[in-house]
Amino acid sequence: MASCDEIKEHPRSLSMCGHVGFESLPDQLVDRSIEQGFCFNILCVGETGIGKSTLINTLFNTNFEELESSHFCPCVRLRAQTYELQESNVRLKLTIVNTVGFGDQINKEDSYQPIVDYIDDQFEAYLQEEVKIKRALFNYHDSRIHVCLYFIAPTGHSLRTLDLLTMKSLDNKVNIIPLIAKADTISKSELQKFKMKLMNELVINGVQIYQFPTDDDTTSKINGAMNGHLPFAVVGSMDEIKVGNKMVKGRQYPWGIVQVENENHCDFVKLREMLICTNMEDLREQTHMRHYELYRRCKLQEMGFVDMGPENKPLSLQETYEAKRHEFYGERQRKEEQMKQMFVQRVKEKEAILKEAERELQAKFEHLKRIHQEERMKLEEKRRMLEEESVAFAKKKATCELFPNQSFLASGSSIRKDKDRKKADGASAFCDCLTAQESVRLCISSPRKDMD
């Protein structure tokens, strides 16, 4: 076993006796890459109106027709647009992600969070595709961000707190290239001081920006020199201006012309050379080998996967899976037991509550029953009294119906006697009246006789 390990660690070099043909592997790789095409994803971070879209148009010499953004966005949102470009026989699928509304809010505390979430979402999407049983990475559109062009306002003073917080949050997730936007607004001397101040602040605050690789002999010299020019001071423009006998891209001012591709005026050419011509593949590789691997490792560690066991022995995926399965099984059993105990406890508590409620209801029932019996007894007593009154009333009624006839007869005879007596009295009175009248008449007639 030891000899086998030794053979693996120290392979022997052999000379071939003739031509085989694997020398064409680089050509095969190139042909396959050309057939598949390439993808490159750029994240542009900067405040609204700082020149992000103009610079991208100038970099790729194409009008991408970006939509204008408002300065009154309530929150930061990211807008991704993908384009198919072709130069000679090389196809490039370019995705430009723009931060809409970045730095426009009054409260900028969490302005960087949507950017971080977007980058993590692209890593997560690639990871989910990678762990599938049937993977389709050949046709998968890789949306992971390969480079972040961070546009810094040309204040000439120092970095804003928002810029420091954002770059600090992104430096372990994406390759950051800081840019001083609209560099034609400050003088050359101020620009050099501003560059030194920015780099000093980035180092003090521990912000890791992308450094052009110097491990390749073919590009180490130029990359090392370009690292000293960071951050790049750039100017973007698609306007063609006539300078001498040729047309150049630039900006026309009353005091002169700023040529975009003139290295004495700005660092646009340096940025294009480093970003597109020299280090585009390194940016793609750094994204996959460094930033994505860091995200993947953290995710797997969160899931419990480790490379080494408790005794510093390497663990296979199957062993890790079995260990994690047993751990999850034990955790499930423990949680089930806790849930059972909690269920029993809650049942007991509920039973106690129900028994207490039952006792209260029984006491209330007894109380209402007692009140009902008392009311019933009162009603029975009232009914008995009413019956007695009814019997007494019936007796009185019968008595009243018997005596009224006798009293009526007695009263009738007395009435007749009174009538007879009244008639006799009337007759005697009438007689008396007649006698009186006769006497008067006689008295009157006697004087007449005397006079005669």
UniProtKB/Swiss-Prot annotation:
Residues 46-53 are annotated as: G1 motif. InterPro entries: G_SEPTIN_dom, P-loop_NTPase, Septin. It holds the Pfam family Septin. GTP binds at residues 46-53, 101, 182-190, 236, 251. PROSITE patterns: G_SEPTIN. Proteolytically cleaved in vitro in a calmodulin-dependent manner. One of its GO terms (molecular function) is GTP binding. Residues 98-101 are annotated as: G3 motif. The keyword Nucleotide-binding applies. The modification Phosphoserine is found at residue 414. The keyword Cell wall biogenesis/degradation does not apply. Residues 181-184 are annotated as: G4 motif. Residues 36-302 form the Septin-type G domain. Keywords: Cell cycle, Cell division, Cell projection, Cilium, Cytoplasm, Cytoskeleton, Flagellum, GTP-binding, Nucleotide-binding, Phosphoprotein. One of its GO terms (cellular component) is sperm flagellum. One of its GO terms (biological process) is cell division. It is found in: Cytoplasm; Cytoplasm, Cytoskeleton; Cell projection, Cilium, Flagellum. PANTHER family: SEPTIN. Belongs to the TRAFAC class TrmE-Era-EngA-EngB-Septin-like GTPase superfamily. Septin GTPase family. Filament-forming cytoskeletal GTPase. May play a role in cytokinesis (Potential). Septins polymerize into heterooligomeric protein complexes that form filaments, and can associate with cellular membranes, actin filaments and microtubules. GTPase activity is required for filament formation. Interacts with ADGB. This is Septin-10. The gene is Septin10.
